[in-house]
Amino acid sequence: MIPVTSFSGKTVAVFGLGGSGLASCHALKAGGAEVIAGDDNADNLAKAAQAGFITADLRTVVWANLAALVLAPGVPLTHPSPHWSVLAARQAGVEVIGDVELFCRERARHAPDAPFIAITGTNGKSTTTALVAHLMREAGYDVQMGGNIGTAILSLEPPRRGRVHVIEMSSYQIDLAPSLDPTVGILLNLSPDHLDRHGTIEHYAQVKERLIAGVQPQGTAVVGVDDHWCAAIADRQEQAGRSVVRVSVKRPLAHGVSVEQDRIVLVSGGARSEIADIGGIGSLRGRHNAQNAACASAGALALGVSRDILQQDLRSFPGLAHRMEQVGRKAHVLFVNDSKGTNADATEKALSSFDEIFWIAGGKPKSGGIASLDAFFPRIRKAYLIGEAAQEFAATLEGKVAYEISGTLEAAVPAAARDAEGAGRAGAVVLLSPACASFDQFRNFEVRGDRFRELVQALPGVTPVV
């Protein structure tokens, strides 16, 4: 745990008592603050009370007595409208911050030179975060990995020399961290997402840019420039005097890092050199993972990791569950769990990675549906549609891709397996990449992916991929 000493002797309200909120309560208390915990959920309030914290309806507190409101990232700050606790804090002149801001203040007070790598982007954050952590760990660092990827940042060990914090950050967390100042900031890509919480793509991009704008003066900003939003951010931040490493998987760069025929190439000062060859690495299959690998490599290089280590340890990266995870094989058929593909942009990355696809898709639909994926329809031999989006997706696929409305994973998995095996096509893949949220049938995308894995591995003749 990281004790938060910057509010010692002061009273702080924490609203939103899930994992990161409760971790904030513990960290603030350990640092000497008095904590008042609030939540709209009675069960969360009860858990906080059982943990020994003062709980209250924050509508009844005297806001003038509070030094700060620490807001959980899941609570609306601006859109669709500010949460009532945010309005109350602002009316009283109380700052509204998040757990990453508390981390940044502690690091600035106690270990400002401790390496801190922050990663964001619409897609690929978790894989890149895990890959950076893997590379740094293999290079001999004491690595603390957390943030949006799972472990709350304040539940990690405190910053110190020789210890690197590798933190995945959502736009919500960035929005609550005005002092964000990573040693290395990585922005992978941007596409419309979470607009219910940001209003417009322009505001969403502005929030993401803050991670790059906050990079320390001697630090490095790594920016994927294959979309126009990020390309513009790279230009602006370079003009502002920051050291920017551009990354592309679509074209060679005159200066920066690119991926050419599975080779990560660095061009700097006119000199061209190969960093690593990622061909044949199953956990880094596909162009999207090439971008993840290139950005992670650029970040590791910025902290002094050698190229020899990069080549060796990119190959030993095991990958992440639910992100192009190979969960089983039966004869010529591969089963791939990409449950994290919760929007069309993410699913595009999966569809672009295979040629003979038996596609399981659907769930709680997102704006835009799957019309943007039509360039990949020729790769799809048949689609198996589940969840609320089934009828909408069927209308999009009509006349272009064979499909059946399976309704559930329990029906879709054996049907897709039967058809893939019967087709006799080399390179056949049963791919779960739903292009949808999971909340219509599952608690989250992890539960959905776990269920897919269970169903696949229960099929006769399937062997796990190791």
From Swiss-Prot:
Q: Name one GO cellular component term.
A: cytoplasm
Query: Biological process GO annotation list?
Result: cell division; cell wall organization; peptidoglycan biosynthetic process; regulation of cell shape
Q: Does the keyword Cell wall biogenesis/degradation apply?
A: yes
What InterPro entries does the database record attribute to this sequence? Folylpolyglutamate_synth_CS, Mur-like_cat_sf, Mur_ligase_C, Mur_ligase_C_dom_sf, Mur_ligase_cen, MurD
What does it do?
Answer: Cell wall formation. Catalyzes the addition of glutamate to the nucleotide precursor UDP-N-acetylmuramoyl-L-alanine (UMA).
Give the protein family: Belongs to the MurCDEF family.
| Protein's name according to its UniProt entry | UDP-N-acetylmuramoylalanine--D-glutamate ligase
Q: Whose protein is this, by species?
A: Nitrobacter winogradskyi (strain ATCC 25391 / DSM 10237 / CIP 104748 / NCIMB 11846 / Nb-255)
